[in-house]
């Protein structure tokens, strides 16, 4: 399973000319100057559609979660399905909500490994109303629309890795409109960190 690094540091989406495995993506993120090998775990944000406000909310929530751990104990990175479809949405997600490394999964192998669940459009719009997603997101100051550009039917999720690169926790979106279970993620990260520090 190969992913391609994406460089967005200067407001331009540029794919690198090489690909690396998921485990190497995790290791590459941990070795960056930002984390300086202090991270005991990493959070991989598997993005449904970068331009949609649900993904912006998820990026913001995951960024706040990662930053709540002291001394860069937790690293973060993201995976997208495509580029050059909504580069404005992708750049906005990176610059305003989730400023961590991004990787391209052109063949969607990571999405397939997570079950490749497809959104039920009726359920999605029903859950937006039922869960109060519109108000919840507006209260966080996030602007945009629920419909973005590009492929948005295959749901995303979150993977949590330990320092060795083993997946210790996986979460897949159910309807695409629910709020992330951040406290579950926090418990999983605390358990991973405690386990690694006790060894």
Per-segment meaning from a language model:
Residues 33-67, 75-77:
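Short active-site neighborhood of thiol/selenol oxidoreductases, capturing the structured segment around
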Residues 58-113, 119:
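Structural microenvironment flanking redox-active thiols in thiol-disulfide oxidoreductases
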Residues 5, 38-39, 71, 153:
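A generic fold-level signal
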Residues 176-192:
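A short, polar/charged loop-to-alpha-helix boundary motif
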Residues 195-199:
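Cysteine/selenocysteine-centered motifs that mediate thiol-based redox chemistry or coordinate metal-sulfur cofactors
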Residues 48, 81, 163:
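Cofactor-binding loop segments of dinucleotide-utilizing enzymes, especially the Rossmann-like FAD-
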Residues 8-42:
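A short beta-strand-turn-helix
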Residues 105-177:
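Thiol/selenol-based redox catalytic cores and closely related redox-interacting motifs
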């Amino acid at each position: 399973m190969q992913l391609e690094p994406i460089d967005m540091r200067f407001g331009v989406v540029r794919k690198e000319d090489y690909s690396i495995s998921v485990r190497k993506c995790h290791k590459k993120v941990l070795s960056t100057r930002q984390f300086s090998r202090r991270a005991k775990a990493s959070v991989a944000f598997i993005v449904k559609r970068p331009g949609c406000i649900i993904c912006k909310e998820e990026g913001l929530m995951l960024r706040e979660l990662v930053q709540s751990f002291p001394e860069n104990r937790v690293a973060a990175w993201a995976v997208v399905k495509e580029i050059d479809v909504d580069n404005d949405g992708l750049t906005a997600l990176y610059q305003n909500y989730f400023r961590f490394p991004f990787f391209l999964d052109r063949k969607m192998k990571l999405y397939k490994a997570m079950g490749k669940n497809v959104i039920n459009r009726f359920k999605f719009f029903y859950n937006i109303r039922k869960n109060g997603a519109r108000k919840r997101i507006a209260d966080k100051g996030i602007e945009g629309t629920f419909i973005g550009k590009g492929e948005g039917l295959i749901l995303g999720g979150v993977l949590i890795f330990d320092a060795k690169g083993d997946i210790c926790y996986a979460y897949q979106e159910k309807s695409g409109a629910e709020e992330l279970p951040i406290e579950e993620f926090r418990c999983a990260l605390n358990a991973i960190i405690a386990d690694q520090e006790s060894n």
